[in-house]
């Protein structure tokens, strides 16, 4: 470890809703906090899979859009300005002889006094478009994630996919894009009936059953070639952007190699949210214990327990029971 590599009090693996609230609460306990997230954006599955869906079982909200909840959590944690590392997947996690945890990602090495794993169902990556030469368009105008809808304003967009995410993104783009087309390989969409009805009544163009067979363009995609699944008829669409929503593949991945007790693809914790390795905690859907319920609301309750016990771990003089937030600001 070099002198300029800061040792954080708490490093959080996973930037979904539980991870974001964990970061806020870590700030409440005056801890230095870092979040490491494998995706290009915070919010986990809420942002990546169903940003426009309503959530009804979060305390205090009769209903709240998934992305709105994420935005509120991000705004909440900004009060303490945690360090955020995006597009980083943790490969190895080990406890050194001095008690400091060393986390090696695909980009760099991090050091921390404690670790809280809030990785949901594990690291997940998008199912990519399996066409020759697609890689050169990524991070240009071939998108697997959408972090800013406004960049599609006035542009011609094609969405590939037939599930909730594909239909949601199409409906979000419909009022701001110049033209939006959704192409699905089946006649019927797998999305919620109400969403499909809204899609059919919108100005979005629907191409079914079609599959993409070619992307045309030198530096960026300029045209998409779609082929009818049954007749093999081909059509060419002029585009400015392509969004692929073929779903995601998730797995615990390297987490299984960190020496943690794993039960049915979840990390076993005790009532302190502590794993079998002192100093490593877990919260949210990634963890399990007797009576565990996998809900966002439960993750929000587990986060303070993990943080307070982590604080007591790396600072034995700290009180486990914190002050009430109403008396702190």
From Swiss-Prot:
UniProt name for this protein: Ferredoxin--NADP reductase 2
Molecular function (Gene Ontology), one example: flavin adenine dinucleotide binding
Cofactor section: FAD
The keyword Endoplasmic reticulum is annotated on this UniProt entry: no
Coiled-coil stretches noted in the UniProt entry, renumbered to this chain: none
Assigned protein family: Belongs to the ferredoxin--NADP reductase type 2 family.
Metal-binding among keywords: no
Cofactor note: Binds 1 FAD per subunit.
Lineage: Bacteria, Bacillati, Bacillota, Bacilli, Bacillales
Cited Pfam families: Pyr_redox_2
First-tier enzyme category under EC: oxidoreductase
Catalytic reaction list: 2 reduced [2Fe-2S]-[ferredoxin] + NADP(+) + H(+) = 2 oxidized [2Fe-2S]-[ferredoxin] + NADPH
Family matches, as InterPro entries: FAD/NAD-bd_sf, FAD/NAD-binding_dom, Fd--NADP_Rdtase_type_2, Ferredoxin-NADP_redctase_2
Positions annotated to bind FAD: 18, 37, 45, 50, 90, 124, 285, 326
Assembly and binders: Homodimer.
Gene3D superfamilies reported for this sequence: FAD/NAD(P)-binding domain
EC numbers on record: 1.18.1.2
